[in-house]
Amino acid sequence: MLTETTITKLREMRLSVMANALKDQMADPQFQNMAFEDRLGLLVDAEWNARKNNHLQKLIRQATFSEPGACLENVEYIPDRNLKREDLLRFGTCGYIQEHHNILLLGATGSGKTYLACALGMAAVRQFLTVRYIRLPDLLVDFNIARGNGSIRKLLAQYKKYSLLIIDEWLLYPFEYAGREQTV
């Protein structure tokens, strides 16, 4: 009876993962002989892991990656791509973000620039940094709409909040073609 009340209270406190873990512990006889601190630790770990995972998934969704499955570990180091493993591993630590440096990826169409940019973005997200991926034409459309309805400052403030802003298709098209009509 006391366990059901505790589980109900945990759910009311929005600790549903902990409540489910407690229910599982009560049903599994191997937990009965564990020390209280050990069982409590397992319950807290379950809740903490679920919350961290949910936060990570939210950051991935908010980043709007074109390739959300991209990761630096899967980059192919083909000789004609001139990629250096040590450079990418260093970029994967996201030190350039804390130092407020930029990375510009250059290469022919189809050489993997978008994948690499998304992989760098995923490395940042895995460190719980806020990331936003956007194509330059879409960014320019956003700016033109904001300029038209007077919300340009709000849009700029929104983009300033990200730890990493990935602008894909940078200058792939002339600015006029991409929808740019005035200076930002």
Name what the model sees in each region.
Residues 1-20:
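Charged, compositionally biased N-terminal leader segments and the immediate start
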Residues 7-9, 61-84:
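Dynamic helix-loop-helix/coil hinge segments at AAA+ ATPase domain boundaries and subdomain interfaces
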Residues 16-68:
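Interdomain "pre-motor" coupling segment immediately N-terminal to P-loop NTPase/helicase cores
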Residues 81-89, 131-160:
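Short glycine-rich substrate-engagement loop in P-loop NTPases that contacts/grips substrate
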Residues 92-100:
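Phosphate-binding P-loop
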Residues 104-131:
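Walker A/P-loop
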Residues 150-184:
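Conserved nucleotide-sensing/catalytic segment adjacent to the nucleotide-binding pocket
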